[in-house]
């Protein structure tokens, strides 16, 4: 994905 910056900033470009 790479569009979930609401939960954690690490899931923004980790997925």
From Swiss-Prot:
Keywords: Calcium, Heme, Hydrogen peroxide, Iron, Metal-binding, Oxidoreductase, Peroxidase. It comes from the Eukaryota. Its cofactor is Ca(2+); heme b. Its EC number is 1.11.1.7. The keyword Oxidoreductase applies. It is an enzyme of class 1 (oxidoreductase). It catalyses: 2 a phenolic donor + H2O2 = 2 a phenolic radical donor + 2 H2O. One of its GO terms (molecular function) is lactoperoxidase activity. Binds 2 calcium ions per subunit. GO terms for biological process: hydrogen peroxide catabolic process. Belongs to the peroxidase family. Classical plant (class III) peroxidase subfamily. Removal of H(2)O(2), oxidation of toxic reductants, biosynthesis and degradation of lignin, suberization, auxin catabolism, response to environmental stresses such as wounding, pathogen attack and oxidative stress. These functions might be dependent on each isozyme/isoform in each plant tissue. This is Peroxidase 10.
